[in-house]
């Protein structure tokens, strides 16, 4: 039976594949979740799990080895300061791949890859966005009510000065 070979080729040359995975890995470390194709996400999972395991050593040599692949100072700093401290008690499986509906346009299989220890942070953001959309809807209603109240007061306002003129006469 035919078996798949790793690493996945991703339809790129070796240098392009390495650069793509390095960029995606650094973005995952910085933003804690990335939406990409399923094949890239699965390949990235292998790489990022190894990077986090290496970073848990905390040595200068480990920093240099991680930087050799990632090539982003901000990502390396975030990895060694935040990600490692949050996933210190975990022995592996630092990332999670969640399958998404196919991409519109070319129907490519899509997936969301995220750091497991940061998943509650991302759900809080979703709740905040939901609240914001409710406020926007509420403010639109408030604006509509306000404009209807203003138009009613404008109609009532000219009647009031006429009444005052009659009282003066």
Swiss-Prot record:
It comes from the Bacteria. Gene3D superfamilies: Ribosomal protein L17. GO terms for biological process: translation. One of its GO terms (cellular component) is cytosolic large ribosomal subunit. Pfam families: Ribosomal_L17 (PF01196). Residues 131-140 have a biased composition (Basic residues). The keyword Ribosomal protein applies. InterPro entries: Ribosomal_bL17, Ribosomal_bL17_sf. The keyword Ribonucleoprotein applies. Residues 124-169 are annotated as: Disordered. Residues 150-161 have a biased composition (Low complexity). GO terms for molecular function: structural constituent of ribosome. SUPFAM superfamilies: Prokaryotic ribosomal protein L17. Keywords: Ribonucleoprotein, Ribosomal protein. Signal peptide: none annotated. HAMAP family: Ribosomal_bL17. Part of the 50S ribosomal subunit. Contacts protein L32. Belongs to the bacterial ribosomal protein bL17 family. NCBIfam families: L17. This is Large ribosomal subunit protein bL17. It comes from Chloroherpeton thalassium (strain ATCC 35110 / GB-78).
């Amino acid at each position: 039976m035919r078996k798949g070979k790793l690493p996945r080729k991703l339809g790129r040359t070796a240098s392009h594949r390495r650069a793509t995975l390095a960029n995606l890995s650094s973005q995952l470390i910085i933003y804690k979740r990335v939406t990409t194709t399923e094949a890239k996400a699965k390949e990235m999972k292998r790489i990022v799990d190894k990077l986090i395991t290496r970073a848990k050593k905390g040595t200068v040599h480990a920093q240099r080895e991680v930087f050799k692949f990632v090539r982003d100072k901000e990502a390396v700093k975030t990895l060694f300061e935040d990600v490692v401290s949050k996933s210190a008690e975990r022995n592996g499986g630092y990332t999670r791949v969640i399958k998404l509906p196919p991409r519109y346009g070319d129907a490519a299989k899509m997936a969301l890859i995220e750091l497991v220890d940061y998943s509650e942070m991302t759900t809080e953001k979703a709740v905040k966005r939901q609240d914001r959309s409710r406020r926007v809807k509420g403010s639109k209603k408030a604006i509509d009510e306000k404009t209807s109240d203003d138009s009613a007061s404008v109609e009532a306002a000219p009647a009031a000065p006429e009444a005052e003129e009659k009282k003066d006469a």
